[in-house]
Amino acid sequence: MAKELNPTENIEKLSDIQRYVTQERGTEAPFTGKLLHNKRDGVYQCLCCHQPLFISESKFDSGCGWPSFYQPIDADSIRYIDDYSHNMHRIEIRCGNCDAHLGHVFPDGPQPTGERYCINSASLNFVDDQNGEQTAG
């Protein structure tokens, strides 16, 4: 279970899918996330605590149905956990600040890292560089 949300937010404000993804380690259905096709320049934050996680320059279209990035904004912004669910080994990624579930990282991304951070839109908050507008996933 992820840590409590920051004082300006509370768990009751999360939608059912946001709560399922971030607090219960769930996964949204592919190709349904609000931020999948977002092309604006800006920063992707943790929905729960607003920790900066990814910048738009590292986002790419992997075709997998979830927003994909080739690297986090900072090494400390992400926490990595071995995940043996579904009879396979994967690397789960969580917010390094509040422990909210974000998605998984796979070794099949583009250069320069070769990694694909496959992230649930429902775990993200996007802040537009142009106008500061925020869009919750």
Curated annotation (Swiss-Prot):
Enzyme Commission number(s) from the entry: 1.8.4.12
A single GO cellular-component term on record: cytoplasm
Cofactor: Zn(2+)
EC category: oxidoreductase
Alphabetized UniProt keyword annotations: Metal-binding, Oxidoreductase, Zinc
A GO MF term: peptide-methionine (R)-S-oxide reductase activity
GO biological process: protein repair; response to oxidative stress
Active-site residues from the entry: 118 (nucleophile)
One Pfam family of this chain: SelR
InterPro entries listed in its UniProt record: Met_Sox_Rdtase_MsrB (IPR028427), Met_Sox_Rdtase_MsrB_dom (IPR002579), Mss4-like_sf (IPR011057)
Cofactor descriptive note: Binds 1 zinc ion per subunit. The zinc ion is important for the structural integrity of the protein.
Reactions it catalyzes: L-methionyl-[protein] + [thioredoxin]-disulfide + H2O = L-methionyl-(R)-S-oxide-[protein] + [thioredoxin]-dithiol
PANTHER family linked: METHIONINE SULFOXIDE REDUCTASE, METHIONINE-R-SULFOXIDE REDUCTASE B1
Family to which this protein belongs: Belongs to the MsrB Met sulfoxide reductase family.
Name by which UniProt lists this protein: Peptide methionine sulfoxide reductase MsrB
Species of origin: Yersinia pestis
